[in-house]
Regions:
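Repeated loop/turn-to-beta-strand initiation elements of outer-membrane beta-barrel proteins
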Residues: 84-89, 116-120, 147-151, 176-181, ...
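Solvent-exposed loop/turn segments connecting transmembrane beta-strands
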Residues: 64-72, 94-104, 126-136, 156-165, ...
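Hydrophobic, lipid-facing positions within transmembrane beta-strands of outer-membrane proteins
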Residues: 54-56, 72-76, 104-108, 135-139, ...
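Residue-level signature of outer-membrane beta-barrel architecture
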Residues: 80-82, 112, 143, 157, ...
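Transmembrane beta-barrel strands of outer-membrane/channel proteins
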Residues: 60, 89-93, 122-126, 153-157, ...
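Detector for outer-membrane/organellar transmembrane beta-barrel domains
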Residues: 133-195
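Outer-membrane beta-barrel initiation region
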Residues: 22-100, 104, 111-112
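Outer-membrane beta-barrel "beta-signal"
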Residues: 210-215, 245-259
Length: 259
């Protein structure tokens, strides 16, 4: 089964789940028991649920240095749509000091709100960088978890039947209204090894960071921090055979901006 066909099935599944959730929502129509004096559906102003909005966020545009070399990393996303239905584009990757692009990931997703704080997402993912390209169907959820953690959990299936999963979580700790400390972690898993992309089955890699940003404006914030990147299990073994680092800690500097 191709990744495109699998993605189509995923999108249809999301639509069915979202439709069922909408059908189960309590009706907002007026009733005979409505208290006198409250506005009715005839007198209430029109709801803006169908207004189209757009948002672009570069969460990380940063350099990472170990004192000898500097790598550059990007992590951004954009969406366009209504309060309930959106089209998302997500992209991340790193430009290494030797000129190679690593860990490139781009996703195109349909997003449907299912609760106040969480959305279902489904679509396609392409791994495009200096290594062989891989395509996946994607299905997951994104939102604000209890204790105000931003959470993304996504599963993937390739046309060859390989499975993968990615979990990302972050938290904004306000020191002042403009000074914000953000811990973040991303974890990747794979069901089978892929020698072409040098990833092994099981827990593959972890990227974690602690960044302190200062919001000069709400739309522009420089930051400093520290980041850890590590490879584990079979992925770590593949890295050693290729004479690559299996983990390091680097100082980071960059900007966070949105529009």
């Amino acid at each position: 089964m191709s990744a495109f066909r699998t993605a189509t099935i995923v999108l249809l599944t999301i639509s069915a789940i979202a439709g069922k959730a909408s059908a189960q929502m309590p009706s907002m129509q007026g009733s005979d028991q409505q208290p006198p004096g409250l506005p009715t559906t005839e007198t209430m102003p029109p709801v803006m649920d169908n207004r189209i909005f757009g948002h672009v966020l570069f969460d990380q545009l940063e350099g990472r240095t170990d004192g000898r070399n500097v790598n550059f990393k990007w992590d951004g996303q954009a969406w366009l749509g209504t309060d309930y239905d959106k089209l998302w584009v997500k992209s991340e990757g790193s430009y290494q000091h030797d000129g190679k692009v690593d860990d490139g990931r781009t996703e195109l997703l349909y997003d449907r709100a299912i609760t106040t704080y969480f959305d279902l997402q489904g679509g396609i993912r392409s791994d495009i960088d200096s290594q062989p390209t891989r395509n996946w169907a994607a299905f997951g959820a994104q939102g604000l978890a209890p204790l105000f953690f931003d959470l993304e959990a996504t599963g993937y299936i390739s046309g060859q039947g390989h499975l993968a999963a990615r979990i990302q979580a972050s938290y904004d700790l306000l020191i002042t209204q403009r000074l914000i400390l953000q811990p973040e972690i991303e974890v990747n898993f794979y069901s089978k090894s892929d020698l072409g992309r040098r990833v092994g089955a099981g827990l593959s890699d972890i990227d974690a960071g602690l960044r302190l940003r200062y919001e000069i404006t709400r739309k522009f914030a420089p930051y400093l921090g520290v980041a850890y990147s590590g490879k584990f299990g079979q992925t770590s073994n593949l890295a050693r055979r290729a004479d690559e680092n299996t983990g390091d800690v680097r100082l980071v500097f960059g900007i966070r901006t949105w529009l």
